[in-house]
Structures are given as C-alpha cells and as structure tokens.
C-alpha cells in the first residue's frame, strides 16, 4: 500500500530520493551488524542517498554506535530500538539485510518478503526462508563491497508488488504459522 508506505517514510524522516535499508535483530555478535555497517559504508560510496535503520537492541549497541561515529556516517544510520510494530515499519523500507553468522528462520525475513522488500541475507540462513524471488543469499566470504554492489544492483529500478498471495501459497499465513508454532511448543 503506497499510501501507508509514504506515511511510514514520513514518520521515519525518509526523503523521497533516499533508499532505506533496514535490519531487524538483537545487537549481538551472531547477527553480524559490524559487517552490516561495513556494507552500508560501501553503499554510501556507491550512492550517498542510502539510509540504514536498525531495529533491535542488545549488548553491542554502544560499540556499533562508536563504529558508526568513527566512520562519520551517524547522520545516515538510525537505531529504532525494540519495536512491536516491525511488520508495519518494514513497509517503509526498500531492502532488508541479514548478514547473520547463523540463523534459523527469521520471522522478520518472512514479513519483509510479504511486504515486497528486496531481501539480502547470508547463506547461513535456511533456504526455507526464501519465499519470493526478491530474496538473495550471499556468502559471508564475500567482501562488504561485493555485498554493497549486489544490494545496489538488486534495488536499481525495482518496482514493488503485492506478495500476499505468494506468502499464503507457501504456507506462511498468520494462521498457518501460529498453528505450526503451537504444535512445536505443545509437542
């Protein structure tokens, strides 16, 4: 919904010409946000209109903030903290990046695909997480520059679409996921 997207972008201070990258996760070593910041720095050299939004909190927050300040990109990075409205917020972004060292099946990644975000994640994440063709898996052995070039290439001239039907077809509707989680916890 373009109207909702516009409202969210306005709330977050994202200008019309800016490209909004997001990351959702606890600020911990396993989520690999230090590498994400390296990727983002490379994105800024390709196009100065990139912005990074980090949703989550954790023990590495101050260390990550120091790194961002030392790279002089603090005006382009926003920490949003822990949010209960991630599914709503992600509608305002253009891309979600998950460079995790290891991960199961991140719910935020499924939500991102439902909102038709381009998703770039490490190949350590289960291939079961791929629902749409707009999800790309990259090796962590690639450089931050390689990741940045791939992200920029994927976002160039991209048009958004409605993935609701695709998500439901793949078995990821709210009801289906809730029932699967209940079964896991109750068994």
What are these regions (language model features)?
Residues 1-14:
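A short helix/loop element that forms part of the nucleotide-sugar donor recognition site in Leloir-type
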Residues 12, 159-187:
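A charged, aromatic-enriched C-terminal amphipathic alpha-helix characteristic of glycosyltransferases
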Residues 19, 23-42, 59-65:
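A conserved mid-protein helix/loop that constitutes part of the nucleotide-sugar donor-binding site
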Residues 21, 36-37, 52, 147, ...:
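A structural motif in glycosyltransferase catalytic domains
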Residues 65-81:
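Nucleotide-activated donor-binding/catalytic signature segment of Leloir-type glycosyltransferases, i.e.
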Residues 82, 101:
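Aromatic "clamp/platform" in nucleotide-sugar-dependent glycosyltransferases that forms part
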Residues 118-122:
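Short hydrophobic beta-strand element within catalytic cores of glycosyltransferases
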